Amino acid sequence: MADNDKNSCSCSFCGKVHSEVRKLIAGPSVFICNECIDLCSGILQEEGSSYKKGDTLDLKPKEIKKVLDEYVIGQEHSKKVLSVAVYNHYKRLSNSGIISDVEISKSNVLLIGPTGSGKTLLARTLARVLQVPFAMADATTLTEAGYVGEDVESILLKLLQAANFNVEAAQRGIIYIDEVDKISRKSENASITRDVSGEGVQQALLKVIEGTVSSVPPQGGRKHPHQEFIQINTDNILFIFGGAFDGLEKIIESRHQGSNMGFEANVQKASKDKDIFCYTEPEDLVKFGLIPEFVGRIPVITSLGELDEATLCRILVEPKNSLVKQYKKLFEMDNINLEFDDSALSEIARKAAVRKAGARGLRAILENLLLDLMFETPGTFNVDQIVISKQMVEESMVNSRLFLKH
């Protein structure tokens, strides 16, 4: 190429001519220089590595739990169990090329606890801490392949979407499946009839949990022969399951009937204190309706206790994204300072404890309590401070007592 021809060609991206760069590569009617190639390569590498921070093991179990403490109040044992399980999981991935003589199994986790005890929040916070893709699914929407409803590949698609279709990142992500107790089979004995939303789903999940290469349709929906698929290996995806398991406590109690008096007394005391789930054994889950193969793929089992009034009161104010902080921020956007008396917070926690809906009950109470205020005060120029009192919570008539500061 003559010098004049070289200088007439320029990079289609940065505009530099041939003499200003080391290399100019030609394509169909376009050119790109080595500098732009290096820049694009750096961007792609940065995006590809952004999800690999979970493998670096920068966070040790104590540090993981410390971050969980900032968002999740109470449930100390479960946070410790999760921190260790997750640390071991990503330690296993980081050393997969080093350890050859011993194969370390995945530390899939089962969280047992009542509604609103923090199961979903724990899983979601873990993914945020580790900076890995996170997907959540409801087991009650899943059906066996070939039947109406979502199949297990739809969960993997959600994980791929969370990873911006970065397959390598998705293969090291976390999947949380809630309401897993709802897919228990109808009886402990195998049934000759098809159970497409119970045992059938457990069988379908088995392959994904233990590790397989799944073909996922990128557009979702059911598979058909003429579509393209994304291949995703589930060997290194961490699965966390959650469920309330209503009725499991009776199975645990019956197992301990006739056992030595000391241990049985502990179980009876735990039953009264709502902590009986900490005595859960794999055989109890099988009797509940989970198939043995499914239970065998979940080596880590931990229970979350029912939240008491004192813990609910702490949940209102202590987490980084606590409900009180969220509502204060919403009112602050309208130039209104929202405050809560300590007695008001205690009353809100008491009402939530009575409802037995856990932390979810707190939001429902606050929404009802603040509804009229959130409707009336925007655009009201003579209101710049509102203080919520215990009486206002008791009566749920917040409009009747506004404390104004001019």
From Swiss-Prot:
CDD domains: RecA-like_ClpX
Gene Ontology CC entries for this record: HslUV protease complex
Domain ClpX-type ZB: start-end pairs: 1-52
Binding sites annotated in the UniProt record for ATP: P114, T115, G116, S117, G118, K119, T120, L121
SUPFAM superfamilies noted in UniProt: Glucocorticoid receptor-like (DNA-binding domain), P-loop containing nucleoside triphosphate hydrolases
Gene3D superfamilies: 1.10.8.60, ClpX chaperone, C4-type zinc finger domain (6.20.220.10), P-loop containing nucleotide triphosphate hydrolases (3.40.50.300)
Disulfide bonds: none
Example of a GO MF term: ATP binding
Positions annotated to bind Zn(2+): C11, C14, C33, C36
Record keywords, A-Z: ATP-binding, Chaperone, Metal-binding, Nucleotide-binding, Zinc
GO biological process annotation, one example: proteolysis involved in protein catabolic process
Database matches in Pfam families: AAA_2, ClpB_D2-small, zf-C4_ClpX
InterPro entries listed in its UniProt record: AAA+_ATPase, ATP-dep_Clp_protease_ClpX, ATPase_AAA_core, Clp_ATPase_C, Clp_protease_ATP-bd_su_ClpX, ClpX_bact, P-loop_NTPase, Znf_CppX_C4
Job description of the protein: ATP-dependent specificity component of the Clp protease. It directs the protease to specific substrates. Can perform chaperone functions in the absence of ClpP.
HAMAP family cross-referenced by the UniProt entry: ClpX
Family: Belongs to the ClpX chaperone family.
Quaternary structure annotation from Swiss-Prot or TrEMBL: Component of the ClpX-ClpP complex. Forms a hexameric ring that, in the presence of ATP, binds to fourteen ClpP subunits assembled into a disk-like structure with a central cavity, resembling the structure of eukaryotic proteasomes.
Identification of the protein by name: ATP-dependent Clp protease ATP-binding subunit ClpX
Source organism (scientific name): Ehrlichia ruminantium (strain Gardel)
Protein encoded by which gene: clpX
